[in-house]
A protein has these predicted regions:
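A short, surface-exposed loop/turn module that caps and links secondary-structure elements
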Residues: 28-54
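Enriched for short, Lys/Arg-rich terminal
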Residues: 1-6, 10-24, 55, 63-86
Length: 86
């Protein structure tokens, strides 16, 4: 059972701002989310919908929709910025 990982335009812009090393690690993580949307280390967020996974100093915030087998990435950013309201 493989999930579809959806990257909205806003997330694609966030990815474009990352350095090559961080981008490579995050891309690997996104590929892993296709097979296992709740990998070890992923945590349910408190106070808002979604999950988060650590990728070095970066965080990937996403929602899981099991009925339609989708993982929608909400935000990708540095750990100091990603939890702040925009």
């Amino acid at each position: 059972m493989s999930y579809v990982v959806i990257l909205p335009r806003s997330v694609q812009k966030q990815l474009a701002k990352l350095d090559a090393a961080a981008l490579g690690r995050i891309e690997d993580t996104l590929l892993e989310l296709q097979e296992k949307p709740r990998p070890s280390g992923a945590k349910k967020l408190k106070g808002r919908d979604g999950w988060r996974i650590r990728v070095g100093d970066y965080r990937v915030i996403y929602e899981i929709h099991d009925r339609v087998l989708q993982v929608i990435v909400i935000q990708i950013g540095h750990r100091r910025d990603v939890y702040r309201d925009s």
